[in-house]
From Swiss-Prot:
The gene is ALMA3. Mediates cleavage of dimethylsulfoniopropionate (DMSP) into dimethyl sulfide (DMS) and acrylate. DMS is the principal form by which sulfur is transported from oceans to the atmosphere and is a key component of the ocean sulfur cycle. The keyword Cytoplasm does not apply. Its EC number is 4.4.1.3. Homotetramer. Belongs to the aspartate/glutamate racemases family. ALMA1 subfamily. The lineage of its organism: Eukaryota, Haptista, Haptophyta, Prymnesiophyceae, Isochrysidales. It catalyses: S,S-dimethyl-beta-propiothetin = acrylate + dimethyl sulfide + H(+). This is Dimethylsulfoniopropionate lyase 3. GO terms for molecular function: dimethylpropiothetin dethiomethylase activity. It comes from the Eukaryota. It comes from Emiliania huxleyi (strain CCMP1516).
Amino acid sequence: MGCAGSTLRSGASFEDSRLAAIEDSRFHEVGHHAQFEDSRLAAIEDSRFHEVGHHAQFDEGGRFKQLPPANDDAKLLVADHPSLGVIRLDYDYPPALGDVDHPGSFYYDVFYRVVPGLTFELCQSGELPDDVKQRFIDAITWLDEQGVAGITGDCGFFMYFQALARSVTSKPVFMSSLCQLPAVVCAYAADEQIALFTANGESLKPMREIIKKECGVDPDDTRFVIVGCEDVPGFEAVANGDRVDVDSVVPHLVRLAEDTVAKHAGTAKPIRAILFECTELPPYSDAVRAATRLPVFDSITCCNSMLASLMDNPRFGVNNWHLSWDGAHTAHRFGDNVPPHLKGKLVNREHPENIARWNASLAERSSFSSAQQESIGRGSRKL
């Protein structure tokens, strides 16, 4: 690191000739290894770093930011806090935090669109009648028109419609967590295994051909270990459309993961990573990571990596996009955003628990003062 007032590699210097007052941090250099104790460069007092050549600076929060060159006439693209678009099945249930259908699972805004008539059974079959297919296309188009940065689905079986979805939009489309398979496979040696966890082990078998076609990966390869969660106590609530008691399921799912990893430990093909196919498995990802010390890829990591490709980096990006979002997710009810003439085509209805939650949020909002209403912004469409 350059000393106070010194010229750095690009000919840059600190305006006040010193790097001062790093809040709650003490920089230590041992040999050639240096680190910040609190893992961040924070609150540089009265210092903003400017690099003339690349127009870089430290902002007031101590974050290193890049600015476009002063003589660059190119238009600066300022993202309006990149958001995610989610295609929903015609199926409602009380989602747990961590589920794709729970907006609180994401650190960015989410727009949902239900496809009337697209039930779980239809999605699992991989075939869409012409009318449902058109509604699916219309739903992708609608999400695109909302300006979402990328699109996904709320069921792993949406892998069947990956090609259809991407033919409708130029936005990145990862309709299933399985879209991560090529990257995960590339990360490990051929003699290292990857465990694929799914809600039901048998249900993944018919998807082999579409996975090979879309991902270039053969799930029949011996490097994959297919693990079904159908016998995990408490997880049957997923199949029943009921609320899952996450706390009660965690120890059982963790035990399943530990046993799966242990079974292959010490063999010629140890398990090196886990991928959750089902969109209702991410609530358990952190517990499994902690127990197995293995990477766990799921539908949330899939969406995060997709959105990160269009996000401003909070450390050295350009636009501070993250400051343009108020942190309140756009509220969504089952069937919202479906055109009125198609609402009658919905096969399922809103889950009673979700109705109660919505009504409770309305009652809470109605108790706010006018000033408080103004402060939360965008009125009753926020939860």
